[in-house]
């Protein structure tokens, strides 16, 4: 249902309707139906939750009709790596089988139902994300912290998530990353916050900025040690060379202003 005007999320609904299952031969027709209600708009996996409810309801009816245990049916028909989604893309590793198997093996699922009004259900769902474009820069500070500048408006904790991704890349704690969401003039082009893309796309930008910092830190350490950069490596938050040469991230950060100036990754 689109409400009083066209524009319901019918396209992602069609993309998601069979996406939890291996369906080798399928055709999906979607209709944007106007009704006498307020206009719809996108909110958290638009289109997917509605079609997943419909699909999983039908799957439960099939299981009941054929006397098949619900997790068994889902495991036997699960989408997995190499399966082509109904709208074309081929899956990498998606974890559908592993998730259902973990549910099936859980103490909760194995506990017998004893009450007259007790029941237990299982449902699966699918959502994708878009990539688009993101930019991020990260600057090493002399106190060992890192300033992360990015352009994705934070509506659900992305500052924390991106800080954790950069911190993991550099082998430091998330608390040592200081994230900031800045305006259009202060960072490279960054697409919309939406489409489940920020942690993925802006996260990749943050990780690449971290990788750039790693390379520059290794080059700076090689200069200090007067050795070939090829023998210096970055490992677990440390810069390690030959002959027992070693800096922690914080130790080398304290030396950057006296050995060539700030280090910024992008």
Predicted regions span which residues?
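Gly/Pro-rich active-site capping loops and adjacent beta-alpha segments
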Residues: 1-51, 116-266
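Helix N-cap / loop-to-helix initiation motif
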Residues: 64-74, 171-175, 228
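Accessory "access/gating" subregions that flank catalytic or transport cores
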Residues: 75-141
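Generic alpha-helical secondary structure signal
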Residues: 71, 94-98, 204, 250
């Amino acid at each position: 249902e689109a409400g009083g005007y066209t524009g319901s999320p019918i396209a992602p609904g069609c993309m998601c309707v069979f996406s939890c299952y291996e369906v080798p031969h399928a055709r999906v027709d979607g209709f944007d139906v106007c009704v006498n209600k307020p206009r719809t708009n996108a909110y958290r996996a638009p289109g997917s939750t509605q079609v997943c409810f419909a699909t999983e309801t039908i799957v439960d009816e099939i299981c009941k009709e054929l006397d098949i245990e619900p997790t068994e049916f889902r495991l036997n028909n699960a989408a997995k790596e190499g399966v082509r989604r109904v709208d074309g893309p081929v899956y990498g590793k998606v974890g559908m089988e592993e998730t259902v198997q973990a549910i099936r093996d859980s103490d909760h699922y194995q506990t017998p139902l004893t009450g007259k009004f007790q029941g237990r259900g299982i449902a699966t769902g699918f959502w994708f994300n878009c990539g688009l474009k993101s930019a991020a820069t990260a600057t090493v500070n002399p106190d060992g912290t890192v300033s992360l500048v990015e352009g994705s408006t934070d509506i659900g904790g992305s500052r924390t998530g991106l800080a954790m991704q950069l911190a993991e890349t550099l082998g430091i704690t998330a608390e040592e990353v200081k994230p900031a969401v800045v305006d259009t003039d202060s960072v490279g082009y960054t697409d919309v916050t939406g489409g489940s893309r920020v942690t993925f796309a802006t996260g990749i930008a943050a990780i690449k900025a971290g990788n750039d910092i790693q390379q520059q830190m290794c080059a700076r350490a090689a200069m200090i040690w007067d050795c070939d950069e090829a023998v210096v490596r970055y490992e677990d938050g440390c810069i390690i060379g030959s002959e027992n040469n070693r800096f922690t991230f914080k130790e080398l950060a304290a030396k950057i202003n006296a050995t060539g100036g700030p280090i910024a990754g992008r």
